[in-house]
Amino acid sequence: MKSKRKKEIGEILAAYEQIRNDIEKKFRQFENTGSRLNKKEIFRELCFCILTVQSRAENCWKCIELLDNTGLLEKGSFEEISNRLKGVRFHNNKAQRIIEARSSLETLMHLLKQENDSKKIRQWLVKNIKGIGMKEATHFLRNIGLSDDLAILDRHILRKLNKLGIIKKIPESLSPKKYIEIEKRMQKFAKSIDVPASHLDFVFWYQETGRIFK
């Protein structure tokens, strides 16, 4: 069992070396977005994370670009947005979530300018933005360079953590308390192999899919 785990860790480290430069480039892009704090960019990233629930990230980003380029992301009606989300699961619900998120944007922008604690920002997002859970909030913060060492726990990551023995089983659902518990375990593992937890989810995703995205 130990030799198997050692082999898997070796594969993780090898994959990390392969894509480390790409990951660091991504994080520089994320940090640039966060440092600009451009309201339009921030809203685009927030809406992207709303769309990613049970949907392919690449498809979601294409939809965001379409909505953004046509001005519908900020001003489109429910019908206009929904019609352009047909390639995304639960497109009607998510169209409504985008419209609802508009009313919280000014408060969010103020929070991002005033608050340095990423965990507090994540907590606010989960509480105040419909369609945003712990995973989506962490994803959003990562994409604007504010995630620190928080972990995006999607099904790919959870499968990998289970395979490594970091969690005994894959939970059917993740309450905020359970999310933080698993996140801490992942952070501890990441520290033990000298890979930032925020980089590790990229590595796990790459191992599962062969891709690096957002």
Task: List PLM regions with ranges.
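C-terminal accessory module of base-excision DNA glycosylases/AP lyases that mediates lesion recognition
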Residues: M1-N32, K113-R122, K130-K214
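Hydrophobic (often cysteine-bearing) scaffold residues that line and stabilize catalytic clefts
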Residues: K39, F43, R56, K94, ...
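Alpha-helix N-cap and coil->helix boundary residues
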Residues: E58-K62, G76, N93, K135, ...
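Short, hydrophobic/amphipathic alpha-helical patches that form generic packing surfaces
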Residues: E45-Q54, E100, R142, D201-T209
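Structure-specific DNA junction-binding interface
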Residues: M1-V88, F213
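Active-site catalytic microenvironments for nucleophilic, acid-base chemistry
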Residues: V53, L66, S104, N143, ...
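Alpha-helical ds-nucleic-acid-binding substructure associated with the helix-hairpin-helix region
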Residues: I64-K130
